[in-house]
Amino acid sequence: FYAKKVLKPLGADISASQFLEPDGMFMNHAPNPEDREAMNAVSLQVISTGAHLGIIFDTDVDRSAAVDSKGREISRNGIVAMAAALVAEEHPGTTVVTDSITSRQLTAFLEDGLGLKHMRFKRGYRNVINKAIELNSQGVDCQLAIETSGHAALKENYFLDDGAYLATKIVIKAAKLFADGVMIDDVI
């Protein structure tokens, strides 16, 4: 659905897209951005076709991850960093709530590199989302709640955990960079 009904009408070349017809059997690999086989399939497809970007979703599209044009995964701490960088452009200094298993390097990137505030909270996408909502109700600007699993919820999207929403923001950023002669790989 996403490739055909969202990306293609926007002018994206989806010819390298794979596994677009749902059959409920998942014969190719588990539809999971945390699954090694699934991420390898996306990476290999991006490399073999020369695509600029690859996107992967889980079955209900509430989690996503990406692959750059060199086949490098943008998942786990990487997807958190990318989502936070997108948010930082529009909301400098905001708080980002993540699950507790993020790395110290991610905290350094968010706080020192992007000028954001990072709050680690207990695992569970509902936990990080509820914490973000709570912070906002207390007057603390929090625009992003995200787990390393790829569950991402943005305030601008009513804190819905929506992998397609985050993927679309990544695709838009990649397209803008490409229009300026820059690949997303160059800014990761």
Question: PLM features: what roles do these ranges have?
Answer:
Residues K5-V67, E111, I133:
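N-terminal small/polar loop signature for handling phosphorylated ligands or for N-terminal nucleophile
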Residues F1, K8, G113, K117:
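Glycine-rich, mobile lid/loop segments that gate access to catalytic sites or pores
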Residues P33-L44, N77-G78, Q138-A145:
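Short, structured secondary-structure boundary patches
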Residues F19-D23, G78-A81, K122-N127:
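Short, acidic/turn-prone active-site loops that include or flank metal/cofactor-
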